[in-house]
Regions:
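N-terminal active-site segment of His-dependent metallophosphoesterases
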Residues: 1-73
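His/Asp/Glu-rich metal-coordinating catalytic cores
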Residues: 54, 65-214, 218-236
């Protein structure tokens, strides 16, 4: 297997308003209004500068189900920059941006893969060789209380690296709604090598040995309780 690199991001919440900040100067307000867009552009730059092979986004790409046209266009433009450099993107939607929300008829670039409500495998090639496969599924509606992890199918081959892309509450984290609840054990027995999770906004690695189970946290704090470093995970995989 050839080595490769990918970025694991989640909870972009593009176009999210800030809460709990009161009245601020108009210049500060404008900066805050643009903050999630700037954070997304920083994510795109990270992918380009890090020479990654692909990007996975584990849900809550947008802040609301009825996502704005502006947010969708900015997402498309950013992912187009990646596609132009041969970097594929794999996306699932979460509780903030489920599939039944409104969206405009924007044509996504080739190389952008948005998963539906049923789990599906997508192969990833590098230099003509399949090096990895991603399986993901999106929320059909906002409040998903089923254990989606149990719906993922086992890998079709043991010779390639596999990634599960899921927006879920693992272990009943009380700081977040208990959507798509599952356990570390559910994920550990799946046969998948790396679980790329979203939903929890604080970076956490729930399991470091195979399979790796990780939350990257969100890329931009959205209220006074979300402070400190934010960003995404750069993951290197070697034979």
């Amino acid at each position: 297997m050839e080595s490769f690199r990918f970025v694991h991001a989640a909870d972009l919440h593009i176009d999210s308003p800030f809460s709990g900040i009161g009245d601020v100067d108009v210049r500060v307000a404008n900066r805050l209004r643009e903050a999630t867009y700037e954070a997304f552009q920083n994510l795109v730059e990270l992918c380009l500068k890090s020479d990654v092979d692909f990007l996975v986004i584990a849900g809550d790409v947008y802040d609301g189900a009825d996502r704005s046209v502006r947010a969708q266009l900015r997402l498309r433009d950013g992912l187009s920059r990646l596609a132009d450099e041969g970097i594929q993107t794999f996306v699932v939607h979460g509780n903030h941006d489920p599939l039944d929300g409104w969206q405009s008829s924007i044509a996504w670039p080739e190389g952008v893969h948005i998963f539906g409500a049923a789990p599906e495998w997508k192969n990833i090639e590098k230099n003509g060789e399949i090096v990895a496969a991603v399986q993901g599924m999106s929320y059909p509606t906002r409040e998903v209380t089923d254990n989606l992890a149990l719906q993922f199918s086992p890998p079709q081959s043991g010779s390639i690296f596999t990634i599960g892309l899921l927006h879920a509450n693992v272990g009943g984290n009380s700081a977040h709604p208990n959507y798509a609840p599952c356990t570390v054990e559910d994920l550990s027995t799946s046969g998948i090598d790396y679980w790329a999770l979203g939903h929890v906004h604080t970076r956490q690695t729930l399991k470091r040995a195979a399979p790796v189970i990780a939350y990257p946290g969100n890329i931009q704090g959205r209220h006074p309780n979300e402070t400190g470093e934010r960003g995404a995970l750069v993951v290197d995989v070697a034979p």
